[in-house]
């Protein structure tokens, strides 16, 4: 049995200092019935907690660390920037370098604005969509999480789902009434919503792969249908690629599925582990953002040199060949997890998109939030705790997916499959 004495003591202290002892709810590990692990360091595919336990890491800071922990090139870039100055409140050339890479690789982006978080990116994109169209309502999908902006915390997934809360108190009714929600992968409901409210729908915002109800890919024709419906009704299509951006493919989710939105939100990978976000799209739309247009958005640390340098060094190491290797590794892990579950007769459904994998303990195919909620949460919690004992660090929520990095080796994946085999053999009874 692993020892967690130091983590337990640190969490006891933290609960007097921060709400729930953490700075983001899912880190409290409530849904898996254990105290959170306090991490001390990471290198490559491994993390180490303050009690000295080693884990193969599939959280990767919730997705950003696509090259694993403490990537040598990213670390050297950060050292060089820190020695010259961390922020100036003025433009720097590294902003141009990262912006060029983003524009080159993301089909929908002709102009990009850097911000400080994924939430900031989605909030800013919604304001832009409303300002550009002159309309008020937005359409989002049940269980899709787009950050903690008020208008987006309506039937959200991810942390809200993990806590078992339908919505967040504090969201005004006046805000909520302008948010239309329909089931993910249900194109007919989208069409009906446009029949009812089409003249006032500014945009549809969607994760190309719903990553905050587990991992739920789009059904064939769903994204194409959204593109068609929005174009027919004069609304903008926004892809929230904070999670999928540069994660599922070299050209992001939109390249993976061949559907180009009007606006795209990015985060996670483009910051290489530092706080970052971005939104971009057609030049005609983006030129409406201040100072070139009237739609205001600003940020004290937007485009700061540390985040830009980490993001640039992260992206330049990603090539089309990187994603071929991601597919191979992810297929290997997916097949191993499925074989272990089948061997022990455990109800399961596995979804995958690129290097994102979701395992649901249910017999039901998971194509939307209702199906994801059919998972056996008690079994997941027990499975999670046993995987920790086996030295594997997974996201502590049924409604979050696993992430792979370039640092994960075949040996890591084989060890993870072996750990899952042990965990499932213990739990099958």
Curated annotation (Swiss-Prot):
Alphabetical keyword list: Cytoplasm, Isomerase, Porphyrin biosynthesis, Pyridoxal phosphate
Superkingdom in the source lineage: Bacteria
Recorded coiled-coil stretches: none
Protein name: Glutamate-1-semialdehyde 2,1-aminomutase 2
Essential cofactor(s): pyridoxal 5'-phosphate
Family: Belongs to the class-III pyridoxal-phosphate-dependent aminotransferase family. HemL subfamily.
GO biological process, any: protoporphyrinogen IX biosynthetic process
Pathway(s) served: Porphyrin-containing compound metabolism; protoporphyrin-IX biosynthesis; 5-aminolevulinate from L-glutamyl-tRNA(Glu): step 2/2
Modified residues (N6-(pyridoxal phosphate)lysine): 268
GO MF: glutamate-1-semialdehyde 2,1-aminomutase activity; pyridoxal phosphate binding; transaminase activity
Catalytically driven reaction(s): (S)-4-amino-5-oxopentanoate = 5-aminolevulinate
Compartment(s) of residence: Cytoplasm
Enzyme Commission code: 5.4.3.8
Subunit comment: Homodimer.
Gene Ontology CC, one term: cytoplasm
Enzyme class: isomerase
């Amino acid at each position: 049995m692993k020892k967690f004495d130091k983590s337990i003591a640190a969490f006891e202290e933290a609960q007097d200092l921060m709400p729930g002892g953490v700075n983001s709810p899912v880190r409290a590990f409530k849904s898996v019935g254990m105290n959170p692990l306090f991490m001390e360091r990471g290198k490559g595919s491994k993390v180490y907690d303050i009690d000295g336990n080693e884990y193969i890491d599939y959280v990767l800071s919730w997705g950003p660390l696509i090259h694993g922990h403490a990537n040598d090139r990213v670390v050297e870039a950060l050292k060089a920037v820190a020695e010259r100055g961390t922020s100036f409140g003025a433009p720097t050339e590294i902003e141009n370098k990262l912006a060029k890479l983003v524009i080159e690789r993301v089909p929908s982006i002709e102009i990009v604005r850097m911000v400080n978080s994924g939430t900031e990116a989605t909030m800013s994109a919604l304001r832009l969509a409303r300002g550009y169209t002159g309309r008020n309502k937005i359409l989002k999908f049940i269980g899709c999480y787009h950050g903690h902006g008020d208008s987006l915390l309506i039937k959200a997934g991810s942390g809200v789902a993990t806590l078992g809360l339908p919505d967040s108190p504090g969201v005004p009714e006046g805000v909520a009434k302008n948010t239309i929600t329909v089931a993910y992968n249900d194109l007919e409901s989208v069409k009906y919503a446009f029949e009812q409210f089409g003249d006032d729908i500014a945009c549809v915002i969607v994760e190309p792969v719903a990553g905050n109800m587990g991992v739920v890919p789009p059904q064939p024709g769903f994204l194409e249908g959204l593109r068609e419906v929005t174009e027919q009704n004069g609304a903008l299509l926004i892809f929230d690629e904070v999670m999928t951006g540069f994660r599922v493919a070299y050209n992001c989710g939109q390249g993976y599925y061949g559907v180009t939105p009007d606006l795209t939100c990015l985060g996670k990978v483009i910051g290489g582990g530092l706080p970052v976000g971005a939104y971009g799209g057609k030049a005609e739309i983006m030129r409406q953002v201040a100072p070139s247009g009237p739609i205001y958005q600003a940020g004290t640390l937007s485009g700061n040199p540390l985040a830009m340098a980490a993001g640039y060094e992260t992206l330049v190491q990603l090539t089309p060949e990187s994603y071929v290797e991601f597919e191979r590794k992810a297929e290997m892990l997916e097949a191993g997890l499925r074989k272990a579950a089948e061997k022990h007769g455990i109800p399961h459904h596995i979804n995958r998109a690129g290097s994102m994998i979701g395992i649901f303990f249910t017999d039901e195919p998971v194509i939307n939030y209702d199906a994801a909620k059919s998972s056996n949460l008690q079994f997941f919690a027990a499975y999670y705790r046993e995987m920790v004992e086996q030295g594997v660090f997974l996201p502590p929520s049924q409604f979050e997916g696993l992430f792979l990095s370039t640092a994960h080796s075949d040996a890591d994946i084989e060890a993870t499959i072996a750990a899952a085999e042990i965990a499932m053999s213990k739990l099958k009874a």
